[in-house]
């Protein structure tokens, strides 16, 4: 190291000491598991997360309420499987998610990370059933093996 390099390094020390250091938890915002279809798109999650979409014609639909209760009871099962949940209870808004999946009434849709539809269900599913359908996917099998 020549004299110039040493001086340059010494000059940087005060700046480095003065800059705030963020921990990993402070640097990252907490992940929001459940998102509204008006605030996101399927393309946003391609190859990043698996997507579970819950459609209904109204947030008051008893099937929608039941599905959301089941999801909210065991969020760790979805977080462990790299899932984001998208809800759409406003068919008049014609969200991009609703148009892409052509939903009518209540529908539960699970998509793989590549965006392909894994399941479509006209009734609520419990977390065990959703988890099993995700765990059968080839990419999920690979993730389990690599742990």
Predicted features by range, described:
Residues 2-147:
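Non-catalytic interaction/Regulatory regions outside core domains
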């Amino acid at each position: 190291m020549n004299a110039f390099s040493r001086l340059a390094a010494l000059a940087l020390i005060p700046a480095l000491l003065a800059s705030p250091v963020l921990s990993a938890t402070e640097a990252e915002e907490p992940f929001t598991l459940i998102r509204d279809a008006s605030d996101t798109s399927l393309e946003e999650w391609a190859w990043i997360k698996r997507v579970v979409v819950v459609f209904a014609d109204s947030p008051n639909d008893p099937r929608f309420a039941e599905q959301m209760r089941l999801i909210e009871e065991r969020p760790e099962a979805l977080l462990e499987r790299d899932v984001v949940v998208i809800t759409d209870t406003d068919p008049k808004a014609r969200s991009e998610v609703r148009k892409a999946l052509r939903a009518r009434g209540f529908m539960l849709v699970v998509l793989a990370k590549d965006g392909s539809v894994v399941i479509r269900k006209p009734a609520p599913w419990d977390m065990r059933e959703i988890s099993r359908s995700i765990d059968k996917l080839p990419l999920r099998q690979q993730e389990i093996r690599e742990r």
